[in-house]
Amino acid sequence: VGTALGSLAEELNGYNRKKGGFSFRF
């Protein structure tokens, strides 16, 4: 589960960077 969560967080970070909008903080 921890690995999946990390992967999701990384994907979200990349998506936000692409959009250049807001940043996610966990």
From Swiss-Prot:
Predominant localisation class: secreted
Tissue: Brain.
One Pfam short name: RFamide_26RFa
Signal peptide range in chain numbering: none
Any one GO molecular-function label of the UniProt entry: neuropeptide hormone activity
Compartment list: Secreted
CC per GO annotation: extracellular region
Phenylalanine amide found at: F26
Entry keyword set: Amidation, Neuropeptide, Secreted
One of the GO BP terms on file: neuropeptide signaling pathway
InterPro entries attached to this UniProt entry: P518
Function noted in UniProt: May have orexigenic activity. May promote aldosterone secretion by the adrenal gland.
Family: Belongs to the RFamide neuropeptide family.
Protein name in UniProt: Orexigenic neuropeptide 26RFa
Species this protein is from: Pelophylax lessonae
